[in-house]
Amino acid sequence: KEKYRVVYTDHQRLELEKEFHCNRYITIRRKSELAVNLGLSERQVKSWFQNRRAKERKII
């Protein structure tokens, strides 16, 4: 099975960044809400948050 890279739209990135700014760790309920609102899977939202936290650690 080949893995493909998700390209997020500007709107999706903006909403995810806003959520991350409020809380670095997303709740299960909020993850579900964001996934539905942004047209993403919960796994994609979870992965985005994991990657964003890793990016933050790398910068520091």
From Swiss-Prot:
GO terms for molecular function: DNA binding; DNA-binding transcription factor activity, RNA polymerase II-specific. The keyword 4Fe-4S does not apply. Residues 1-60 bind DNA. GO terms for cellular component: nucleus. The gene is CHOX-CAD2. This is Homeobox protein CHOX-CAD2. Keywords: Developmental protein, DNA-binding, Homeobox, Nucleus. Belongs to the Caudal homeobox family. InterPro entries: Caudal_homeobox, HD, HD_metazoa, Homeobox_CS, Homeodomain-like_sf, HTH_motif. It is found in: Nucleus. It comes from the Eukaryota. PANTHER family: HOMEOBOX PROTEIN CDX, HOMEOBOX PROTEIN CDX-4. Gene3D superfamilies: Homeodomain-like.
